[in-house]
Amino acid sequence: MDYTLTRIDPNGENDRYPLQTQETVSGDPLEQHVHRSVYMGKLENAMHDMVNWGRKNSLWPYNFGLSCCYVEMVTSFTAVHDVARFGAEVLRASPRQADFMVVAGTCFTKMAPVIQRLYEQMLEPKWVISMGACANSGGMYDIYSVVQGVDKFLPVDVYIPGCPPRPEAYMQALLLLLLQESIGKERRPLSWVVGDQGVYRANMQPERERKHAERIAVTNLRTPDEI
């Protein structure tokens, strides 16, 4: 019986021996298979929803204020508004025990490093609310000593407009709509994690865009004496 030897060309195309064909797999294949499972996917999603439900209904604010907007913030803790109904009445004196911080008032240049250090001392998960025109964009203080928006050095999650905003605006931003809705859609590791946490946060639609169609559809406007 005759045998024929065929030399394999490493640089050529070889159907039988694809020496140059390599597949790069990112991550653990077993873990990817588990996450692709319908049962495990639903179970993991249910665990995320349960953990986020606890987080969004027990938000502990860090207690500090910068200006007059802080007065409107603490007004929501009175019996008239009763922010305790939503589990956010536990004021923390230490940033290590707080879930979110509210920058309420005018942020001066000398105060910015202090606020940034307090934010870095907060443990994950943590959120930031910018309350009032001064915190959002500097307000009427277009001057060298005032930071033109705290988002220059902090990742802001929710902006509250107004000069100053009413307590109802603070409660709407914190509890009734914006921050709780954002926390409910987050996906972060459910176990101890060292290093990058891989947090997924859904994009929040601005209230101006969300209510644009409703406001444009209004044809009968109220008279000024009814406002």
Swiss-Prot record:
It catalyses: a quinone + NADH + 5 H(+)(in) = a quinol + NAD(+) + 4 H(+)(out). [4Fe-4S] cluster binds at C68, C69, C134, C163. It is a peripheral membrane protein. It is found in: Cell inner membrane. GO terms for molecular function: 4 iron, 4 sulfur cluster binding; iron ion binding; NADH dehydrogenase (ubiquinone) activity; NADH:ubiquinone reductase (non-electrogenic) activity; quinone binding. Pfam families: Oxidored_q6 (PF01058). Binds 1 [4Fe-4S] cluster. One of its GO terms (biological process) is aerobic respiration. Gene3D superfamilies: 3.40.50.12280. Its EC number is 7.1.1.-. Keywords: 4Fe-4S, Cell inner membrane, Cell membrane, Iron, Iron-sulfur, Membrane, Metal-binding, NAD, Quinone, Translocase, Transport, Ubiquinone. NDH-1 shuttles electrons from NADH, via FMN and iron-sulfur (Fe-S) centers, to quinones in the respiratory chain. The immediate electron acceptor for the enzyme in this species is believed to be ubiquinone. Couples the redox reaction to proton translocation (for every two electrons transferred, four hydrogen ions are translocated across the cytoplasmic membrane), and thus conserves the redox energy in a proton gradient. Belongs to the complex I 20 kDa subunit family. NDH-1 is composed of 13 different subunits. Subunits NuoB, CD, E, F, and G constitute the peripheral sector of the complex. This is NADH-quinone oxidoreductase subunit B. The gene is nuoB.
